[in-house]
Regions:
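A short beta-loop-alpha structural element at the N-terminal edge
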Residues: 1-4
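Acetyl-CoA-dependent GNAT
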Residues: 6, 10-62, 68, 132
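A short, internal acetyl-CoA/4′-phosphopantetheine-binding micro-motif in the GNAT/acyltransferase core
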Residues: 40, 67-77, 105
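Conserved acetyl-CoA-binding loop-helix of GNAT-fold acetyltransferases
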Residues: 72, 78-91, 114-118
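Conserved beta-strand-loop-alpha-helix junction that forms the acyl-donor binding cleft
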Residues: 77, 103-112, 130, 134
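Conserved GNAT acetyl-CoA-binding A-motif
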Residues: 86, 93-105
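Conserved acetyl-CoA-binding loop of GNAT-fold acetyltransferases
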Residues: 117-127
Length: 135
């Protein structure tokens, strides 16, 4: 877990130990429809990870795969690691019977937006809405 949390902190600039502890508790084991995949080099150094799950019937959407986290070490980008991770999670989604993959990306995150577009993802007919809550 520490290698994933460290990679995330190097890229995001934010330490999220409690978040990663929760993620590993929920997604670290093998459960149908939940995926936490990692890529390592020959020395067991973490190169990247991707995580997602099958979600069903959110606002009448049939079951689909959701990717909600991906990171690749900056030294390993453009080496196909992200593509390999994305293809692996898509293969996992196919094996459990879903045929659509979705994600949410910040408009400001051009790197991740470009990556997902390079994988064939595009805007869908669903729109994300949000509001700020008063304290």
């Amino acid at each position: 877990m520490s290698a994933v949390a460290d990679l995330d902190q190097r890229i995001s600039g934010i330490a999220k130990h409690d978040y990663w502890q929760d993620v590993f508790e929920r997604y670290g084991g093998r459960r149908k429809g939940r995926f936490f995949l990692m890529a390592e080099d020959g020395n067991k150094k973490l190169l990247g990870y991707i995580m997602g799950e099958v979600r069903a019937w959110e606002f009448d959407s049939p079951p689909c795969g959701w990717v909600f986290g991906i990171n690749v070490d900056s030294d390993g980008r453009l080496g196909g690691i992200g593509t390999a991770l994305f293809q692996a999670i898509c293969d996992g989604f196919r094996k459990v019977g879903v045929h659509t993959v979705r994600t949410t990306v910040s408009r400001k995150n051009e790197l991740v937006m470009s990556f997902f577009r390079s994988q064939g993802m595009m805007a869908s007919h669903y729109i994300q809405l949000e509001t700020e809550l008063d304290p």
